[in-house]
Structures are given as C-alpha cells and as structure tokens.
Amino acid sequence: MQRILVGFDGSEGSEQALNRAMMLIYEYGELFLLAVIPSPKDKSFVDANAYETMKKKACNLIDNVIKDLGEQSFKIKRLVEEGDPATVIIDTSSRLDVDLIVLGSKGQSELGQYLIGSVSNKVVQYAAKPVMVVR
C-alpha cells in the first residue's frame, strides 16, 4: 500500500490501527494520521477556547506519536480536521486518494467519543475506498 489513512484519537483501538497500518505501508509510501474534532459550531463547545484547546490537543497527540515513531522509510503526515468524524474520514480518503482506510473497532479517549465505534461502521458502509477495522 502506498497511501494509508488512519483514524487516530489516541485510544487503544486507534493505536492498534496505526500498528497494523505500519505493517502494510510500502517503503516510501505515505501514512496519514487523521484526528477529527467537532466543529466549533457543534453545541458541545460553549466558547472558542474549548475548540482551540481540543484542536491543540489533537495536534499535540499526533505530533507526539510521529516523534515516538522516529525515522521511517515512509512519510507520516498529521491531519486534524473538524466535523462529523465518519464524513470527514470518507471525504479525506477520497481527497487524498488513499489506498486504504484503517480504523480501530472500539476505544475511548478524550477525542475517542468522536472517532471510534459507530463511526467505523458508517465508514465501512459508505466509503468508496477499502476499509480495514482492527480489533
């Protein structure tokens, strides 16, 4: 696989998805780590500070993972998008023309409420790209 998109929220499920994706990625390929946060228009945000805090947390989470992975034979890119997680994952996979989407089957983290569980089911149903759900 040359281009793999991993839905990542820091949960154990997303860590397992990342590990599986790393086994599948070709040398000199591209691995995209995508965190999806709610839109600031979402009712869960009382003020703009809460949105900015969550966005920074998502960026730091992925940056730390990339740092921990160290030098690889493939590129790793951070993506932080806002909106409905399943829709964002599906749209991003098409926009980036990835070969595979890899998601955890379940999990929970501070970002996890927006990424894991029913989201993977929706992505499997509606994505135009192949999807791997890791248990």
Label every PLM stretch briefly.
Residues 47-53:
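Short glycine-enriched, charge-decorated loop/helix-capping segments at active-site entrances
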Residues 70-101:
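Structural beta-alpha unit
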Residues 25-27, 70, 128:
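Short conserved AdoMet
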